[in-house]
Each structure stands twice: as structure tokens, then as C-alpha cells.
């Protein structure tokens, strides 16, 4: 009999504890009642009720894949004017990054020599001179890019903003493309 009374009392305790636990949690009061929002529903009349982006379909076209390869930051914009280029370079200098110029005759990564791109597959670009440590003039970077273009007219040229404290590349954008 002792066993059955113990079971009965534990069941009774569980039955009594369940409502107490549910009432211990306070209701969430961060949201407003749904009755405060007006609801207007149109009757369902077939396919006309399906969601549609309507006239915005023309905005969702992707870039053509032939002849318009894209690179890093800013490559989806038109070619930068000299003023825009100076502003971008001033931005990276203002952030304390070291400007560095790189060029490549390939411009695009390929997998001709191995399953993964390597040195001879356009993965690595050649540095033009040394990084411009201590450079505070954006015009000097543009002048170096023009000099690189004069030396290698068929090359892609990019500017890199290098953080020499964290030792990472922070920004990279194309400044010259071959004609």
C-alpha cells in the first residue's frame, strides 16, 4: 500500500505543478495586438492573387557573360574618371592603408596548368615597383599607374590598399584595362 500511495502522491504533485509552471512565465509584451492593424483581404480569384514583381523584371537582368568580365570592388561601375580615381585613392590613404600597384597581362584566372589556378594561370599579379609606403598624395599613385600603363599597354592594372599593421589587403580595384 505504501508504494501505491507514493505513486498517487507523485502523480498528484505533477498535476498540481504543471499549472504553476505555466503561470510562472510572464507573457511577452513587446508586440502590439494584431487587432490594432487594419486587415484588408481581397477574395482569392485564381492566378491574379499570386505575388509578382510586375514591372521590376527588367531591373533583374544579369551582366552578359561574354566580353564583360568583372573583377573586384567597383568593377560593376563604369570606368572611373580621374577625379573618381583620386577620391578612391585618397580614401585608402586616409584609412592608413599603403597604396600598391599590380599589373597582369592575363587579367583572368584560368586552370590551364593544374586543377587549381597557380602562378602561371593568372592567379598572381606582378607588383609594379614597391608598395608606396608613406605616400600621402593620391596624384602620385595615379602618376605611377600611368607610368605602368605606358610600359605595359596591354596589361590590367589595379590599385591595392594594404594594411601593414594587420598584414591584409583591404581594398583592390582596377584602374586600367587593355583596349
Swiss-Prot record:
Q: Which UniProt keywords apply?
A: Calvin cycle, Carbon dioxide fixation, Chloroplast, Photorespiration, Photosynthesis, Plastid, Transit peptide
**Family of this protein:** Belongs to the RuBisCO small chain family.
- Where does this protein chiefly localize? plastid
Q: Name one GO molecular function term.
A: ribulose-bisphosphate carboxylase activity
Q: What does this protein do?
A: RuBisCO catalyzes two reactions: the carboxylation of D-ribulose 1,5-bisphosphate, the primary event in carbon dioxide fixation, as well as the oxidative fragmentation of the pentose substrate. Both reactions occur simultaneously and in competition at the same active site. Although the small subunit is not catalytic it is essential for maximal activity.
Transit peptide, from-to: 1-58
**Name of the gene:** RBCS1
The listed locations are: Plastid, Chloroplast
* Complex and partners: Heterohexadecamer of 8 large and 8 small subunits.
Top-rank taxon, per record: Eukaryota
Gene3D superfamilies (UniProt xref): Ribulose bisphosphate carboxylase, small subunit
Additional note from the record? The basic functional RuBisCO is composed of a large chain homodimer in a 'head-to-tail' conformation. In form I RuBisCO this homodimer is arranged in a barrel-like tetramer with the small subunits forming a tetrameric 'cap' on each end of the 'barrel'.
For biological process, the GO terms are:
photorespiration; reductive pentose-phosphate cycle
Q: Which organism is it from?
A: Fritillaria agrestis (Stinkbells)
Annotated protein name in UniProt: Ribulose bisphosphate carboxylase small subunit, chloroplastic 1/4
Entry's Gene Ontology cellular component terms: chloroplast
Amino acid at each position: 500500500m505504501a508504494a501505491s500511495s507514493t505513486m498517487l502522491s507523485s502523480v498528484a504533485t505533477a498535476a498540481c505543478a504543471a499549472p504553476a509552471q505555466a503561470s510562472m512565465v510572464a507573457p511577452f509584451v513587446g508586440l502590439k495586438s494584431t487587432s490594432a492593424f487594419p486587415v484588408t483581404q481581397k477574395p482569392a480569384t485564381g492566378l491574379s492573387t499570386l505575388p509578382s514583381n510586375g514591372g521590376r523584371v527588367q531591373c533583374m537582368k544579369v551582366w552578359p557573360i561574354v566580353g564583360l568580365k568583372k573583377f573586384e570592388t567597383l568593377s560593376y561601375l563604369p570606368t572611373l574618371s580621374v577625379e573618381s580615381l583620386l577620391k578612391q585613392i585618397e580614401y585608402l590613404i586616409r584609412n592608413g592603408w599603403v597604396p600598391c600597384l599590380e599589373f597582369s597581362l592575363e587579367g583572368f584566372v584560368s586552370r590551364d596548368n593544374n586543377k587549381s589556378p597557380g602562378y602561371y594561370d593568372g592567379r598572381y599579379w606582378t607588383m609594379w615597383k614597391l608598395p608606396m609606403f608613406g605616400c600621402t598624395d593620391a596624384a602620385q599613385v595615379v602618376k605611377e599607374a600611368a607610368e605602368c600603363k605606358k610600359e605595359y599597354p596591354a596589361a590590367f592594372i589595379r590599385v591595392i590598399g594594404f594594411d601593414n599593421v594587420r598584414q591584409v589587403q583591404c581594398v583592390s580595384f582596377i584602374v586600367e584595362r587593355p583596349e
